[in-house]
Amino acid sequence: MAHPKEFAGGLSIGIIMDGNGRWAKNRGLPRTAGHKKGAEVFKDIANYCDELGVASVYFYAFSTENWKRPLEEVGAIMKLFAQYLIEGFDYKNRNIRIKFLGDRTALDPKLQKMMNELEGDSACKTGMTLNIAINYGGRPEIVRAAQQLAAKAAAGEIRPEDINEQMMSDAMYTAGQKDPDFILRPSGEKRLSNFMLWQAAYSELVEMDVLWPDFTRADLDTAIEEFNHRSRRFGGI
């Protein structure tokens, strides 16, 4: 078991769940089988983060660009959200606060209702914050924040010259939460894919050559240990 270092505000991790389709293709299975296995891994890794004492974790589940995939695949993914990410996770018996990041207005009303209820029911929890990014994109999030501040400026609530980084951060979906200390991407890919672009300014990047459906608790231990040995300078020396 990994032992996260002591950080101000606790350890915060971003995870890009990547490789479901390739995992299925390598086994001659439909892509939906990879997403199902990936959802099972999500549950286990989320539980493990809680057991490790991680303060907050951000899972990239569905991007704004993922709508471009075949309708059958998108439909299957949406069903998995309800079955695994929401209904199938033991939230009630864990001290976990749930937050959903992204534009949920494009999602099925039933799914939206489930998401809203989960956030409300867990709002008073004091343990780890579990963030699930659904219909999320880093650029749209920044545009949304800028529009909110522009509207306030137009209404005379703030002056444009007073807008600063903290005000932008407070207008993000992640308002009030710590930026990720490191972002983990399985599958061997080396890009952020529009994930937490504002919040990742000084996040360490940890890439691993394992597809998400094969990802284990031991792999997370390895990622945390690698991060523990990084020297973060935040632009200094």
Label each region the model flagged.
Residues 1-237:
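Flexible, compositionally biased loop and terminal segments
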